[in-house]
Design a protein with these regions (language model features):
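Contiguous, non-catalytic segments that form substrate-binding/exosite surfaces or channel walls
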Residues: 1-118
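Active-site recognition of the HExxH zinc-binding catalytic motif
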Residues: 10, 111-115, 120-140, 157-164
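Inter-helical turn/loop segments and adjacent helix faces that build the functional surface
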Residues: 26, 49-60, 139-146, 167-178, ...
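Secondary-structure capping and boundary motifs in well-ordered enzyme cores
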Residues: 35, 66, 101, 105, ...
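Glycine- and acidic
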Residues: 54-60, 107-115, 139-146, 207-212, ...
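Active-site-adjacent bridging/hinge elements
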Residues: 98-106, 132-139, 194-202
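Post-HExxH zinc-binding segment in Zn-dependent metallohydrolases
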Residues: 149-189
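Long, amphipathic alpha-helical stalk/connector segments used for oligomerization, subunit docking
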Residues: 172-250
């Protein structure tokens, strides 16, 4: 349907170019192809080099971390990030996301809690909190207009991942937050902030994009891009997607 509708909206354009530009103004396949090729050229050798080294120990991230304690951590993180909790709410879902209801005055973020891994929710909240900070930073006179809530999804994701990775996984922030983690989860008291910093920055291939580390995250996006491009050009049928997904991930 997406490919067909392009025939009426912009018949002179490639269907995927049309929808890329609708999603991110001015974005083209040529730009994506060049960008991902450069990224792949550097990420794949880097990942091989990492895998050849002794692996970091992230056992401290796994254990039993009660959901109610993780919820307290979420509240602490949101307040620490400077979110106005009078206008930003938190709920639980399977897949974390952020949305506005009507305007940036009513912002909703979600997370999920895994009782065997508190870091999953911790970084989801920081990530979604980055989205919410960008949304709630919109000018009040733009509320309830199409300009409310940010310039583009590309900028939006840059803000969320800036908070999640450049700040949230930094040595400075992990050192700051570690005493609170030990307060909520006493079993961490036998570890150090430096051990926590190293554990949350462990790089290894995974199947879930939202759980991916900073090195391998972009590989998940590349797979989705290649599949979507082929579907839009009629080179891959939707019912064949699961098998092709499995092949590319292997």
């Amino acid at each position: 349907m997406r490919s067909s509708s392009r025939c009426y909206c912009a018949p002179e354009k490639d269907p995927y170019d049309y929808w890329l530009s609708e999603y991110e103004d001015g974005l083209t396949m040529a730009q994506c192809d060049e960008f991902f090729a450069t990224l792949r050229e550097h990420i794949v050798p880097l990942l091989r080099k990492i895998k050849a080294q002794p692996q970091l120990d992230d056992a401290m991230l796994h254990g039993h971390f009660p959901e109610e304690k993780q919820a307290q951590l979420s509240d602490y993180l949101m307040r620490t990030m400077g979110l106005d909790l009078d206008h930003v709410g938190l709920a639980t879902t399977e897949h974390p996301f952020t949305t506005s209801l009507g305007s940036h005055f009513d912002e909703r973020i979600t997370t999920h809690y895994l009782e065997d891994n508190f870091a999953s929710s911790m970084f989801s909240v920081i990530h979604e909190g980055g989205h919410a900070l960008y949304d709630t930073g919109s000018a009040d006179d733009l509320a309830y207009t199409v300009l409310d809530g940010g310039v583009s999804m590309g900028i939006h994701e840059s803000q969320s991942r800036f908070y999640e990775n450049l700040l949230g996984r930094s040595r400075a922030f992990t050192g700051f937050v570690f005493p609170k983690l030990c307060e909520l989860f006493p079993e961490l008291a036998g570890h150090t902030a430096e051990e926590f910093y190293r554990a949350i920055n462990k790089a290894e291939p995974s199947l879930i994009r939202t759980e991916a580390d900073e090195v391998t995250y972009s590989l998940h996006v590349m797979v989705r891009y290649e599949l979507e491009k082929r579907v839009m050009h009629g080179e891959l049928k939707v019912h064949d997607l699961p098998a092709e997904w499995d092949r590319l991930y292997k």
